[in-house]
Amino acid sequence: MPQKDIGYLIKNINDKLKVKADADLKHSNLTLAQSRVLAFLDSKGGQATQKEIEVYLEVSHPTVVGIISRMEQNGHLRCWVDETDKRNKVVALTEQAKAMGEEMEQRILANEKMLLASLSEADIKKLKQMLLIIYNNLE
């Protein structure tokens, strides 16, 4: 591969990861963004507010509304208005989505293992540190 600037490489890595993840998830009728919502909800005990999902994904309100709406139509999520604060919409995993959790976690681990296969543990640790620095520079 010809020498490219770092931003270009990061973008291309992201694009390739998204294509691979979307292909892996197609049989589950999920996209990468939707799988991230499922993983987040799982980490929060199965439910969270729509606003919490927006903050976690770092995307706009309309983007989250679209993602959640499609997932609800596909039977992955249930949604309702929070009785204690009507401004909040609560989003929860369905039993169908909960059952997919273990398989999705295994796919994530397999993809990460493939991605980092030629790196040592020290290289991986250093890479994480450097990526966090770059990420924080953009804040």
Q: Can you describe what each PLM-predicted range is?
A:
Residues K18, S69-Q129:
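Charged, amphipathic alpha-helical coiled-coil/dimerization segments
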Residues A23, R70, I133:
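Alpha-helical DNA-recognition elements
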Residues I10, L38-L41, L131:
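Hydrophobic structural patches
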Residues M1-S28, N74:
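N-terminal leader segment of winged-helix/HTH proteins
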Residues V19-S60:
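N-terminal helix-turn-helix DNA-binding core of bacterial DNA-binding proteins
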Residues K125-E139:
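Exposed, interaction-prone assembly regions rather than primary DNA-binding/catalytic cores
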